[in-house]
Amino acid sequence: MIFWKNFFQNSNINASSEKNFKKLIVLDKTCDKIEFKDIYLSSNKNINLYELEQLCDSVGWVKRPLKKVKIALKNSSIIISLIQKKDANSKLVGFARATSDNGFNATIWDVVIHPDFQGLGLGKVVIHQLIQQLRQAEISTITLFAEPDVVSFYKKLGFIKDPDGVKGMFWYPR
């Protein structure tokens, strides 16, 4: 339990509530000047499927049938999205979700940050928020599946690869 307390106390996420959104203080230091990004965190489960599809396309994910994506979202315990608001427009720039047995275990799925917003700590924000909500629900085991090129990112957030030699197993129809 000490690990989780330190995990969230050491978080440098600044947010203030605004209805269903939390405004994040995000600075883009990649250009010559420091620029503020108007990004809000939401746990609203009503996600525009077409915006989500565009976000997934932006990182090169394989297209999935929207009908099945809708079912997956409906069956998710937690959905976190990051929305950039500019004037009257808004854009989905980050997303992740978790499924759970609501007793012991949960799995994090579909963590995606738009390429224009990667490197700003937003992936860390999304994962921290999911873990925080799952721990509040007293979920003790949180798993995820990661592509080889992002395993180091999750290790930095406290995830352990193959703990105690445990291996994930899959069954696929032939």
From Swiss-Prot:
Primary location class: plastid
Domain of life: Eukaryota
Gene3D superfamilies cross-referenced by the UniProt entry: 3.40.630.30
Disulfide bridges in this chain: none
GO cellular component term, pick one: chloroplast
GO molecular function: N-acetyltransferase activity
Keyword Secreted: no
Subcellular location: Plastid, Chloroplast
EC number: 2.3.1.-
Pfam short name (any one): Acetyltransf_1
Annotated ranges, domain N-acetyltransferase: 42-174
Identification of the protein by name: Uncharacterized N-acetyltransferase ycf52
Organism: Pyropia yezoensis
